[in-house]
Structure formats: structure tokens, C-alpha cells
Amino acid sequence: MKAGIIGLGLMGGSLGLALKESGLFESILGDDINEMHRRQAIYLGLVDECVRENEIFNCDVVFISTPIGGIIKIIRNIKKLSKNQLIIDFGSSKKQILESIPNHLRANFVSLHPMCGTENFGPKAALKDLYKNQIVIFIDIEKSGEKQIELAKKIFIKLGMNIIKMDSNAHDAHAALISHMPHIISYALANSVLKEERAQDIVAIAGGGFKSMSRLSKSSGNMWVEIIKHNKYEILSSITSFKKELENAITLIENNDFMNLEKWMDNANKLREIL
């Protein structure tokens, strides 16, 4: 079998390394709209060869790991697929992606979301073990072909991932809360510090707490604007919920109600029981 990867950044590049190690494919082809990324992917050994998008779709399995707008555009440009071909997208919100797939090609698609990543981006950020022991969510697979589902499962089990099934509505709501909103909070924290006159001095004394919470603010703005744009309403709902919790904390502090502030914090501690 041949595999093709469109988008050779952190996710696509790491996938290339993992697929090479898996031994499932005789060759792995890649494509990226950024010419430098194409050259870096070859130099770093992420893929065997870089070709153009139309050649990628001659592969048995095609992985699309571009920003969401790019995924939708690529899907709309597909004219035809062979009966057994498998197309996998890595989009981090799903409803708009799934709605863009033509009915006559739907069986070829398995839409999934690997729940892993780092704040780094581009081919140089690729990690061979990025996917190992992580969760991958298979979304709305009841409309995918049986052969496509089985092959997708085989691939990601081989990569050491744990498979969870979910519908697109639940996925997009959950992803907004545990993935998308934390990035926005991290950007907000970073901007709060950067607007101070002596931001560099403040950061110089930062401990683990600040570094942990601000880490996500190093993520690609271009990629995250795409994610937010395509999951806007779920993210706004999550931010509204978070805002209410902040307002609650502000009220407790303003009123010197430290007993209930501690109870508020103790309630948050319960998260440890399910993590």
C-alpha cells in the first residue's frame, strides 16, 4: 500500500515518521502548499517523496492534516475515488468538514481527531512518538465504508493509539471545552503580561505555573484562527461558561468571602478524581 499525507507540519510530519516505523506502507508521499515545508520534510525523512496533490490521491490511503479551511477546500476538489480508497482528515472540529463531503464519496472517508500535539509547528516540530499511547476519536463513522473503518482502525492501533467513537456534535462541544478554549485562555494570559511595561522582567521570575499555562500561547495563530472560525459557537459557549466562573471568583474576592472562595477551589480539585 501507498500512503499520502497532505500537510507536513507537526501532525502530518509526525504521522510520516510513525507510518514509516509501522511498516504498513511500502512508500509514503507528501504534499504541502509551503515549498520550504516540502523541502524540510524530505530532508528530515518525514516522507519518501513530495509530489503534488493530484498524485497524492493515487495513494491507497490519504491523510489530510491541513488547517480546517484547507481540508474543506481539498475535499471539494476531489472528483472521484476508487471504491476501496481511504481518506482520513485530522480536523479538530468536524461538523463543517463532514458537511462538505459529497454523498457519493462519503463511504471513502473516516473523519478522526488525534488528541495529541505540542505548541510547536512546522516539519521541524515532528515527533516520531507523538501519537503513541494517545487517544484518537473516530467521528460519525456509521456513514463510512466497512473496509475503510477496519483499515483506519488497523493503522491507528498499529501507531499505538486508543480509539474512541463519538458523534460530531458531541465532539465539537467537548473539543471546544478541553482543547480550543484552553488555547484562547493561554493567549489571553500571555497578552495580559505582554501589555505590562516591564513584561520581560515579569517573565524572568515566572515559575512552573505560568510556564504551564502560557505554553499554548506559542501555538500557530494561523492554525488556531481556522479552528476557532469553524467551531465558533461551541467555543463561544465554552468561553461564556468560563467567564461566569471568573466573575464568580471576582465577586468572592471583592466581598472578602474567602470561605466560599476556598470551597470554589476545593470543588475544582475534584477534577483530579477523573483525570
Please identify what each model-predicted range represents.
Residues 1-53, 61:
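NAD(P)+-binding Rossmann beta1-loop-alpha1 motif at the extreme N-terminus of oxidoreductases
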Residues 2, 27, 108, 135, ...:
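Residues at the starts of beta-strands that form the adenosine-phosphate
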Residues 24, 44-46, 83, 104-105, ...:
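Short, structured coil segments at secondary-structure junctions
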Residues 33-34, 66, 90-92:
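Short beta->alpha hinge that forms the Motif I/post-I loop of the SAM-binding pocket
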Residues 54-88:
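Rossmann-like NAD(P)-binding element
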Residues 74-124:
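Rossmann-like NAD(P)(H) cofactor-binding subdomain of soluble oxidoreductases
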Residues 128-215:
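Internal alpha-helical scaffold of NAD(P)-dependent oxidoreductase catalytic cores
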Residues 199-268:
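Interdomain hinge/lid region at the active-site interface
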